[in-house]
């Protein structure tokens, strides 16, 4: 009985992720983009936190990733030339639409998150090679990316 009570207590006291104060200026666009794309609440907010931590140096492009990713959604202009990654509102809506496209392609949000982080081609190749155990063959960074975001949202 103690174990069951402990499990119940865990779920009763577990707190879901909530956006940090730095996210507040962007929440109207984030919430609208999530709603328009049928996303779980705070999925996009959590993705953007994972990508930029809502740090101004990243959002403004002063700091870029080693892969050339820029802005709040860490968009690589070479792969996504139709969006201005330094336009915050445009990037938020683009990231939501792109993640939803990935979800529709792969069938679930977890795989969509992996594809956002690691790339569609890499996820497709891993699925072909490893079947349903594909995530175990993904880089640790991608495994952590998915669990950090989805674990806080689901």
Question: Where are these predicted regions, by residue range?
Answer:
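Catalytic glycan-binding domains that act on GlcNAc-containing polysaccharides
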Residues: 15-154
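Single-pass alpha-helical membrane anchors
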Residues: 1-17
